């Protein structure tokens, strides 16, 4: 049966049967591929099989060392250290790109057996460059070893549409807003009962506001226009006792194209919608694509 500590961590499994591998078995290489638990009868005839869920094993084997490390593109002491936690990966390479996102090189990364992380170090010339990780990893859906090029889950900066991660130094004065180092929170965060929250949608807050510059509407930049009607309203709320502004959604939305050249909005020619969305040309709206109408 599971130990007391295991039952506490996985209470939904406390009544399940527990099995153990032979002592001395190196589990880490096994977690890089397909793991199947099988049951046989006394004659060794297969009676059943199931795929193994490895999340608990990964935590047990790697978490102590892994949680002591810093991840991402770390700028420190004139060097840039790239570190990614990918214990199940067969191999990881750092793929580098210039400002136009042209490939400029690739560097092999080394895995740390204790933490399961992969890392490689470069010079300060990499600050400002874009990068991705080339990963070879077993995928449980395809049940094959797959190759992927992915952005860094620990990214501090990303290119348009989050297609490339970027190396940035957050201590660089050029990246700090004026007065950033002396900025202090206007309200204490210690007692949640003293917090009064106003919730707002990033787009809706300024999206249709005529006092906000067109190029800032519906964007974070809309909050920087101190004399606009929405921001003036927020200031009045602050004077009335509102202490915190909760913006949402602030995560990356893959279905929203950030490239203005590939976006069609209300008021644009319908033909532009046909250009940016090929499916429209194959729909019942196809006849409108060359009619000079607006959306």
Briefly describe each language-model feature range.
Residues 2-77, 81, 112-225:
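The feature marks proteins involved in alpha-glucan
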Residues 5, 101-108:
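Surface-exposed loop/edge segments in extracytoplasmic proteins
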Residues 85-91:
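Short proline/glycine-enriched turn/loop motifs at strand-loop junctions of beta-rich domains
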Residues 94-97, 132-134, 142-150, 208-213, ...:
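Short, solvent-exposed loop/turn and secondary-structure capping segments
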Residues 211-225, 257-295:
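Aromatic- and acidic-residue-enriched carbohydrate-binding clefts of CAZyme catalytic domains
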Residues 231-250:
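Catalytic domains of carbohydrate-active enzymes, especially glycoside hydrolases
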